[in-house]
Amino acid sequence: MPLLKLWAGSLVMLAAVSLPLQAASPVKVGSKIDTEGALLGNIILQVLESHGVPTVNKVQLGTTPVVRGAITSGELDIYPEYTGNGAFFFKDENDAAWKNAQQGYEKVKKLDSEHNKLIWLTPAPANNTWTIAVRQDVAEKNKLTSLADLSRYLQEGGTFKLAASAEFIERADALPAFEKAYGFKLGQDQLLSLAGGDTAVTIKAAAQQTSGVNAAMAYGTDGPVAALGLQTLSDPQGVQPIYAPAPVVRESVLREYPQMAQWLQPVFASLDAKTLQQLNASIAVEGLDAKKVAADYLKQKGWTK
């Protein structure tokens, strides 16, 4: 083979080897502003970084509408979202599929892929559904174990004030759905609207009786509820969809880093309700940094060094 041809061929091979490295774009990792958002966002961030993926940290970017807008506009590349929010995103709250873990996942996966080129990866088995938690002393004194009991208590004129995010108060599939199903209506004087969506803040407000609050917006995987003396109320009518957390990534980014799906699959598969409650409690009750809690969990499980 002529030397010139050999030299040219070597350059082509070198370029082919070097191209992925040159083309590798930093992955913008985001999450919601609450405790679990910080935990899951840091888990995704650290898993990607452990495999040498360059990242931009946008963890705890904002509320659901903010983060959703960011990924659909390309400002974010990946973030953890909840399957049940598909009902809200696609204005499809009446479909019973959202109340079935597998059907809800398959539906939002299909819709987001078709409409937004967003890919839903393996979800966690946990259900982080919205709920209402009341102070233990109030629950015991008034025999409150379910939202039906709460409705009866309110109709009897019971004292009640709920700390919640504006999103929970306003979204049709959140507090208004509970009110409609159980036949009660909270007045403005019975609501304390708090910035952001961090249930650690709403639960703390109820525990400390801030501004007369004795109940809080909470999630099914919240760690601080029992630790701070509150009790979640069951939802016997099954008003809420299943909210299983899963990484959502832009299709173009997944094409660039196809191994991302297999890296994150076992991690999210390990996050059952008990595990998430414990990890969330480490942050919200013990005051540990979400970054450290995520790092310790990943190391303990052998997914990072």
From Swiss-Prot:
SUPFAM superfamilies: Periplasmic binding protein-like II. It is found in: Periplasm. GO terms for biological process: amino acid transport; amino-acid betaine transport; cellular hyperosmotic response; glycine betaine transport. It comes from the Bacteria. Induction: Expression is sigma S-dependent. Induced by both osmotic shock and entry into stationary phase. Its main location: periplasm. The complex is composed of two ATP-binding proteins (YehX), two transmembrane proteins (YehW and YehY) and a solute-binding protein (YehZ). This is Glycine betaine-binding protein YehZ. The gene is yehZ.
